[in-house]
Amino acid sequence: MNIFYFSECPITSAKAQPDKMLVKMPLETAQMLCTAHRIVGSEDYCNKHDLYKKAYWNHPCTVWARECSANYLWLYAHFLALGNEYKFRYGREHASITKLKMPLVRLPANIKLSYKRTPVAQAMPHEYKNDDPIKAYRDYCTH
């Protein structure tokens, strides 16, 4: 479970995903977005749209996703971009995109509204973390 944050732009960040990460990232991202709905959203909405069950709800990236609407919306845009990149590379739509792109477009009902994102979680060994999360993730993924 992680958000490989290679760029401030969710599209550029998705395009930078290595193949071995890209195959699993639409699912992991969907799990984080669904967990946001399960924790700060409506259980009725989750059940009506058959959202994934809560997963790794205390993971730093999953917590980050539900901290505020700006975080959630960035991650949702990244989710769509991951899906587009997956389709470009593999010629088919990822199952998580097919199932969840429409229900996840809606913000969780009780998420804190904000136009500004909080600092992205750096879920990696301490030696790679620094003030620049883009550099931290690039260093982490190349070592």
Residues of each region from the PLM?
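An N-terminal structural lobe/cap that precedes and organizes the functional/catalytic core
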Residues: M1-H94
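Intrinsic disorder and flexible coil segments
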Residues: N58, I97-T98, A123-P125
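A glycine-rich phosphate-binding loop feature that marks nucleotide/adenosyl-phosphate handling sites
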Residues: T98-V105
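Aromatic-residue-lined binding/catalytic grooves and analogous aromatic/hydrophobic interfacial grooves
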Residues: R106-H143
